[in-house]
Each structure stands twice: as C-alpha cells, then as structure tokens.
Curated annotation (Swiss-Prot):
It catalyses: [(1->4)-alpha-D-glucosyl](n) + UDP-alpha-D-glucose = [(1->4)-alpha-D-glucosyl](n+1) + UDP + H(+). Pfam families: Glycogen_syn. The keyword Glycosyltransferase applies. Residues 641-656, 666-676, 693-715, 746-781, 795-830, 838-878 have a biased composition (Low complexity). This is Glycogen [starch] synthase. Its EC number is 2.4.1.11. It comes from Dictyostelium discoideum (Social amoeba). Residues 637-721, 746-878 are annotated as: Disordered. One of its GO terms (biological process) is sorocarp morphogenesis. SUPFAM superfamilies: UDP-Glycosyltransferase/glycogen phosphorylase.
C-alpha cells in the first residue's frame, strides 16, 4: 500500500495510533511521494497517455464524489490538457446548468458515430461547466434500456435483482461505458488508456473491460464500501467484528448481494485498487477481500478558501451574521445573553444519526452544560446541527423573532437619522442641544412599542428552526432525552437547522463556507467516515475541529503532524475506548476550548489555517499520479531484457519470474548508499512462484511450482527490523538483499536438480504448464480450486443466501491472445516495490491460458465470482 511513503504502519497497527508517521510539512509529504516514484521507476504519462474518469456524479451533483471530481478537475486538466475527459450518465434535468455541448473533434467524432451506428447508444459530447472546463462524454441511458435484460443476465445470471432500478441503470451504464472505451482503444491502438472508475455505480465497465481483454489500464476507487455503510448504520460493531463476519452472507441478508458483488468484483479485476483513507483500506481488506495499492486522500480547491491575512477579518464578518441570528432567536426570551462571551460550535453532514456521531455530539454538549453550570461560568455555547431532514416550513416562532428584530433595527436606524438631522441643525446655528431634545416623544413611543412586541414571545427559544414532519426524528428524541431545551439557566444552547445553508436563507443568510468561517469550532465524531470533507473544510477555513480516529481525515492528518492538538485538530478515540469514555474525552476537549481567551483562540485559528496546504490538490494529486503510473506499469509492462543463454549446464536455467533481474539490480546498487527506512516492505515474501526454463531446444516448456524460502528470524547486522504491531517489516541493504536473493536462487536450483534426479515431479499447490512455440501460440489445460471461493448463487432464488456446504462448479479454460497479465494484488499482499521492478522487466510477448474456477464454499472469499462475459457483437447490440 502506498500512502506518502510505501512504509504504511496504520493498518498493521489496526487503527490503534492517533500519531502515525510524522511529516513536518506538505513539502516533506511531496518529497516522500517523489522519492517513492523514482525508486519504483514506474512509467510516467506521455503524449500517448489518455485518462478517463468515470463516475455516476459527472456533471450531476449527488454526493461527495461530485465535489472530489469538480475540485480535482483544474489540476488534472493542467496535467493532461486535451488528453483528459470524464464519462458519466446524461441527466436532462441537470445538464442545462452543468453541461455545454460541443462539436466533437476528429478523434471523438467517428467514435461517437460508431456508438450510434453499431450499438444504438447516444453519446453527448461537451464540456463540464466547472473550473478547468474538462471535456465530458455523457451517455444517454434510455438509448440502451431495451438491452437491460440481456446484459443483466450476462453479468450476474442467477442472483440478479430485476426490481432494483439503481442497479439496473448501473448495469446499462457499465456496458455503455465499456463499449465506448473499447471503441477508443481499437481506434487508437498506439495510445495508452487509463480508466479511473469511482464507486461501484460506475465500475461495471471495469469488469467488462477485464472480461473482454480490452487493452485499457484500470483503477477502481471505493470512497466508502457499500456493505460497510449498511453495517455501520445498522448498529453493527463494524471494526471489532469485521474479521469474523461473513460479508457475502451479510450482504445477502440485506438484499444487496448483487451490488456487493459488483463492488467486490471491481476491486479484484482492477489493475490498481485504491481507497480514500487507510480506515477504508482496512475495511476493504475484509469486505472486498483486497488491500488497496494506493491511498488517494480527498483534497480541496484552496482558491475557494484562501484568505491569507484576511481570514480573521472574515471570521469577524461572518460571526456578525451569526450574532444577528442569535439576537432574533434568543433576545426577548431572556436579557442576560452576552455576545462577547458566546462561542459558536457546529456539526454538519448527511442525516446519519449514528454514523456521523450526532449521539456523542449531543451527549458531550450535555456534559459541557453541567461543567459550565457547576463552575459558574458566564460563557454561552451555541451549538448548531446542520443536517437536512423532512420539513414543511420554517418555525413560526423563529420567523417572528427575526421579524421583530428587523423591525427594531429599522426603527433604530430611523431614529438615529432623525437625531443626526436635529444635531446638525442645532450646531450649525451655534447652539448646544440637550440630550432630551435629541430624542423626541414620538421616538420614545416607537421604541417602547418595539420593545413590548419583542418581549411578547409566548414560549421559550425553539430548538428547531423548521417544522419537522417526523416528530420521532432521532436527533429530536435525543435532545428531549438530555433535556437541552434552551432554557435560561442552560449555558449550552442547541439550534437544529434541518436544511443545508444558502445565502438566501431568511434565518442564517450564509453559504456553508461562510458559516464555517464564522464559527469557532467544528465537531465531527463520526463512527463511519471514509474521509471526512467537513473537518477538511474547517481546516482550510481556519476553524479548529474535533474528529474521531475512525475518519480518513484524522488518519491523514495524524500521519502528517506530530502534535495535532496544537494545530487545532482534536482527535477522539472511538476505536479502543467505550462510548462513555469517548464522550468524556470530547467533553474535556470542549471544556478546555471554552477556557481559552480570545488571543489564544486567534493563535489556534492561525495554526489551523496554515495546514491547508496539506489538503491542496496540488499536494494530494501526486497520489493520483502514482496510481496511474502503477496501472500503466501493470497493464503495459516494458519489454523484457534480452540475454544470451550460457553453454554451461549449471547456468543454463533462466528464472522467468524476474528473480535474476532482482540480483542484477542489487549488484548494480552495491556501490550506492543503502536505502532509507520506509522505502521497502516485505522485500522477501515467505513464498515465491518461480518458473525455470531450460534452453536446450527451440520449443520450451515452462513449469510453475510453489517454493518456500525460510523466514528471516534473526536480522543480520545490515538488516533493520521495524516493529509495526502486526508483523515485522525489514529494511535490507543492497548487500544483504543480494545475499538473500542468491540463497533463494541456489535453493531453487537445488530443488530443480532433485526433481530431475528423482524423475518424479513434485506436486505443487498450483501447477500450470505452458508450451511456447516459435510462432508464439499456446494450448494448455489448467485446473485449479480456489482456497476461499466466492459463494455461487442459486439460479432458482432472486436473493442469494450463501450456504456452508461447498460444491465445485465446472472449470472453464480459455486461450487468450498474447496479452500481458497484470498483477492485481488480490491476495492481500502489501505493495512490493522490488516486485514491481521485476514485473516491469518480465516478458510481455507470450500466450496465456486463462482459467476460471467457481466454488460454493462459504469459508471465505479471495475473489468474486468469475463469469465469462463475451464481447457483444455490433449485430447483437443494435
């Protein structure tokens, strides 16, 4: 796994640390990525590299992926220019404001025409109306809905859900996008294509590209696993039970196995699998059965947040708007509200009561209220909850209070203007005017009426600003349970605003970014948060925040900073502490924050705002570059190094796995300095697959066997052990690694000689025989049984329920064209830089024999159900 540097310790420690590998600044983070890319020697994009981003949210705002693609677009367009485009479904309702049609160029025009002529698929070409104006291909789903039944059966026959409209549209879009990419690859065979699929709704096309053997390198990013979100929302202790749950069975119980299968299969089939955080990577390891190759943290477009020296002035400006809201909401109910001793805290996001940690947020507010009351503090804390829920209108009491306040302000402005005229008239005549003459009787009457109206509020300050349709809303029920009703003696006031903020809001006329700048503290103790854009936006706005160690943002920042508290990022422990302990920890954070004076809060805001560079796409975009380069390396490996066979019998064996290349590489590096700590993980795995090829006849036979090397138990003087809490990670110097590789080579030669002497081949775990002729054609039969196969659904049931009885299905053998087979890292093995180097030197001109094996054993899964999906002909798709 790659995250800043290849040596990632967070997953090995199983989420137990809140202070990971330190980076002093964004500069060190960048240099770590650059150094890693240089060491891996992976391919960089050229003028013949074309990049596509595929998502359900291209030019259509649905969730957070829209923000990721939108803010990342300027940086990607700057890098790829016209060689970058996005692919998404066409939406007639959002297209007028998000999409501008363009005339296709000479490259795209024939492809779009072929899509209509061959398959009847209508593709809209144009530009996305966001900064950078990237080109987009929006595909009309309705033009292929008549093929839904055929495609659905072809993809997942036996366990499909015909009534799932979202999945039906996902399947149609998947086939359409795969056919579009296939047309590009066939029309321009000299170009190298990278297709980056975001989330399972867009990834059916990835599965099809793999089945059809289309020469396109693929990346799959899960921003949150589908089943993980279901389990967390259902109250399952996800991170403690993840290792014992049968994920396929859990998905079947919830009626989402067909969706889960798409996500799991996409992770297995992609050349590079990525997630947005290490916590999601740990989750994917158990739910999708594959560790991520690269971590891609979400970034922000900092131009939107940049304020430099003005950010404190902006805080004062937008805090003034919040002060105006507080006056209208609370004034008239009680008169001891001191705005100079008032702090504004908030939480925001989707209405997910448990996943977003709203329960702990409210419990900590109740604890803070007691502490402030017991200490006799004059500080008032106003806590906002900005989460959308079903409403039918604004609360009448809220509107009345703001209406009275606006009327009061207009009256005061009128009186002040009249007083100014009187004062000017008197002084211009050389007369002094008494205070009684400044304020007329009419003015006094008007003021008394306004004050009387303001005090005629029938009830206390409302907790909710709108009329809720669901009176049993979980947030409302919790507020009633802790009895925070905004009474006068409460030092903590709660404002539940069940609607996203806009500048046209009659109560709080601020955009969300402006609202964040006006607040003092953001609180996001989420239980399930793959990354967490809300605390990231707080950081970019100079607003300190509280988050949990189960969020991707906390993972990222704890690795980048040695002391997060001093930078305004407070991380509570939801992994190893009980709920009560976590609430107490958060209450203490809030209590300490209320004890800061104004100067200390300003210094904390300054420290937080300086971290924004860590979240800039120009910093985080390098992780995307790494993922793309790695995908190119696996999909299009370089040509092998040609070497002449030696006449000596003892040296006439060539290691086709690239082990000899490793030795040669290490010999070249012996004169160089040893590598620094943190550049290599598991250089010598416990087992290796080695192919030995005799060079005696023109026709060569390659036999793959499984050999095991002895584990390294005692480090040599030049071997540095690193304790990660899960396994030892050893960093080897070039001399020691060359020695170990030579020992491995001798061991393999010894085994080969023993096999030749006994003339009885040893039965390996998995044996495959490939005969290569000078014409590079091959025919072979390969039968294998997966150790942890994916449950095969019964064709007689619409909702698949895995069973505990195993039965092996028919094994299918197909002969592929001379195409390199990339390593997908589906066995959960961590990223190996040396392995990547040797793969880059392996031969790409050979015929392969592909074997698919399906076993219905419920003992676990290593890869999703493998189904043969033929390339549909143009005739069948018309």
């Amino acid at each position: 796994m790659i995250f800043g540097t290849p040596n990632s310790t967070f997953l090995e420690n199983r989420l137990g640390s809140s202070t990971g590998m330190p980076f002093s600044s964004a500069t060190s983070l960048n240099s770590g990525v650059d150094q890693m890319m240089n060491e891996l020697n992976i391919q960089q994009p050229t003028s013949h590299t074309v990049l596509f981003d595929l998502s359900w949210e291209v030019a259509k705002k649905v969730g957070g992926i829209y923000t990721v693609l939108k803010t990342k677009a300027p940086v990607t367009v700057e890098e790829y220019k016209s060689r970058y485009a996005l692919i998404g479904p066409y939406n007639a309702s959002t297209a007028p404001t998000e999409f501008e049609p363009l005339i296709p160029g000479p490259l795209s025009s024939p492809i779009i025409e072929n899509m209509m002529k061959k398959y009847g698929i209508h593709v809209h070409f144009g530009k996305w109306l966001v900064e950078g104006y990237p080109k987009v291909f929006l595909i009309d789903l309705h033009s292929s809905m008549h093929k839904l039944g055929e495609w659905r059966w072809d993809l997942m026959s036996g366990f499909e859900q015909a009534g799932d409209n979202e999945t039906n549209e996902t399947i149609v879009f998947g086939y359409q996008s795969a056919l579009l990419l296939k047309e590009f690859a066939e029309a321009n065979p000299n170009d190298k294509y990278i297709a980056h699929f975001h989330e399972w709704q867009a990834s059916v096309g990835l599965i099809l590209l793999k089945k059809w053997k289309v020469p396109v390198s693929t990346i799959f990013t899960t921003h949150a696993t589908l089943l993980g979100r279901y389990l967390a929302a259902g109250g399952v202790d996800l991170y403690n039970q993840m290792q014992v749950l049968n994920m396929d069975f859990e998905a079947s119980k919830r009626g989402i196995y067909h969706r889960h299968w798409i996500e799991k299969k996409s992770a297995a089939d992609s050349h590079v699998f990525t997630t947005v955080s290490e916590i999601t990577g740990y989750e994917s390891e158990h739910i999708l059965m594959r560790k991520p190759d690269v971590i891609l943290p979400n970034g922000l477009k900092l131009d939107k947040f940049t304020a430099l020296h003005e950010f404190q002035n902006l805080h004062a400006k937008y805090k003034g708007v919040l002060n105006e809201f507080v006056r209208g909401h609370f004034y008239g109910h009680y008169s001891d509200f001191d705005l100079d001793n008032t702090l504004y805290v908030f939480t925001a996001g989707r209405h997910e009561y448990f996943n977003k940690g709203v329960d702990m947020f409210l419990d900590s507010l109740a604890g803070l209220n007691k502490l402030l009351q017991q200490s006799g503090s004059k500080m008032t804390v106003v806590a906002f909850i900005i989460m959308p829920a079903a409403t039918n209108n604004f609360n009448v009491e809220s509107l009345k209070g703001h209406s009275y306040l606006k009327d009061m302000r207009r009256t005061c402005n009128t009186i002040v203007e009249a007083m100014g005229e009187r004062l000017f008239e008197a002084t211009s005549r050389g007369k002094m005017i008494s205070p009684e003459e400044l304020l007329s009787q009419e003015d006094l009457v008007m003021l008394k009426r306004r004050i009387f109206a303001l005090k005629q509020k029938s009830s206390g300050p409302p907790v909710v600003t709108h009329n809720m349709i669901n009176d049993n809303d979980e947030i409302l029920q919790h507020i009633r349970r802790i009895k925070l009703f905004n009474s006068q003696e409460d030092r903590v006031k709660v404002i539940y605003h069940p609607e996203f903020l806009t500048s046209t809001n009659p109560l709080i006329p601020l955009d969300y970014t402006e609202f964040v700048r006006g607040c003092h503290l953001g609180i996001f103790p989420s239980y399930y948060e793959p990354f967490g854009m809300t605390p990231a936006e707080c950081c970019a706005s100079g607003c300190p925040s509280i988050t949990s160690n189960l969020t991707g943002f906390a993972n990222y920042m704890s690795r980048a900073l040695q002391d997060t508290d001093s930078k305004g990022i407070f991380i509570v422990d939801r992994r190893f502490k009980s709920s009560r302990e976590t609430v107490d920890q958060m209450t203490q954070y809030l209590w300490k924050f209320t004890q800061l004076d104004r100067r200390q809060r300003i210094e904390l805001r300054n420290a937080t705002e300086k971290l924004s560079e860590l979240l800039d796409w120009r910093t985080l975009g390098k992780f995307y570059k790494t993922a793309r380069a790695l995908a190119l390396e696996r999909a299009f490996p370089p040509k092998p190094i040609s070497r002449s066979p030696s006449p000596s019998p003892s040296s006439s064996l060539k290691l086709s796995t690239g082990l000899s290349n490793q030795i040669e590489l290490q010999q070249q590096q012996q004169q160089q300095q040893p590598q620094p700590i943190g550049t290599t993980i598991n250089l010598i795995p416990p087992s290796s697959n080695v192919s030995v090829t005799p060079t005696t006849t023109p026709t060569t036979t390659t036999t793959a066997t499984t050999a095991t090397t002895a584990p390294i138990t005692t480090p040599k003087p030049n071997v540095i052990p690193i304790n990660t809490g899960k396994e030892n990670i050893t960093l080897l110097s070039p001399n020691s690694m060359s020695s170990l590789l030579s020992d491995s080579l001798n061991e393999f030669k010894k085994q080969q000689q023993q096999q030749q002497q006994s003339k009885t081949p040893t039965t390996p775990t998995t044996t495959s025989t490939t005969t290569t002729t000078p014409s590079t054609t091959a025919a072979a039969t390969n039968k294998s049984v997966l150790s942890n196969p994916t449950p095969t659904p019964s064709p007689n049931t619409s909702s698949f329920i895995p069973t505990n009885k195993g039965s092996t299905a028919t094994t299918t053998t197909t002969t592929a064209t001379p195409t390199p087979t990339p390593s997908n890292n589906t066995n959960g093995k961590p990223f190996n830089p040396i392995e990547a180097l040797t793969k880059s030197n392996s031969s790409s001109n050979f015929a392969t024999t592909s074997t698919a094996s399906v076993n219905t054993n419920n003992g676990g899964t290593n890869s999703p159900v493998s189904k043969s999906i033929p390339i549909p002909s143009s005739k069948s798709l018309k």
